[in-house]
Curated annotation (Swiss-Prot):
Protein family membership: Belongs to the GreA/GreB family.
Listed Gene3D superfamilies: Transcription elongation factor, GreA/GreB, C-terminal domain, Transcription elongation factor, GreA/GreB, N-terminal domain
Region forming the signal peptide: none
Disulfide bonds: none
TM annotation in the entry: none
Originating organism: Streptococcus pyogenes serotype M1
Name of the featured protein: Transcription elongation factor GreA
Source taxonomy: Bacteria, Bacillati, Bacillota, Bacilli, Lactobacillales
InterPro entries attached to this UniProt entry: GreA/GreB_C_sf (IPR036953), TF_GreA/GreB_CS (IPR018151), Tscrpt_elong_fac_GreA (IPR006359), Tscrpt_elong_fac_GreA/B (IPR028624), Tscrpt_elong_fac_GreA/B_C (IPR001437), Tscrpt_elong_fac_GreA/B_fam (IPR023459), Tscrpt_elong_fac_GreA/B_N (IPR022691), Tscrpt_elong_fac_GreA/B_N_sf (IPR036805)
Amino acid sequence: MAEKTYPMTLTEKEQLEKELEELKLVRRPEIVERIKIARSYGDLSENSEYDAAKDEQAFVEGQISTLETKIRYAEIIDSDAVAKDEVAIGKTVIVQEVGTTDKDTYHIVGAAGADIFSGKISNESPIAQALIGKKTGDKVRIESPAATYDVEIISVEKTN
């Protein structure tokens, strides 16, 4: 069975690698030290410090595993390989809702780099899926769980 790939820009992959390094070289040793100290308190059956450290260790190891998988199966998307005005991962798109003056700016990223609070939307989101492959001037119907609406693509630029 083929493994799932994780489309992302080179910058996104580098950010994941940096996060992985932080977890392995800083967080993991800190937690091991906390576990060692908590063990020194004696009876582990009622040792909340030990339980908390073990829970954090499990969480961090899960994060490490997830990041390693995403990095291993990263599919680097070169936004320069698509037309300059075509929406793709690694591009910033400004859309205007048809019939209004409302404009929204989206940075299309791989799922691993999504951060809605900074305008970075996953290529797997309904908005991005509707926009990817379209060009400046195209009118697009976006169907999201919250609403269905039409937008016009005002501009498409490579994200820095």
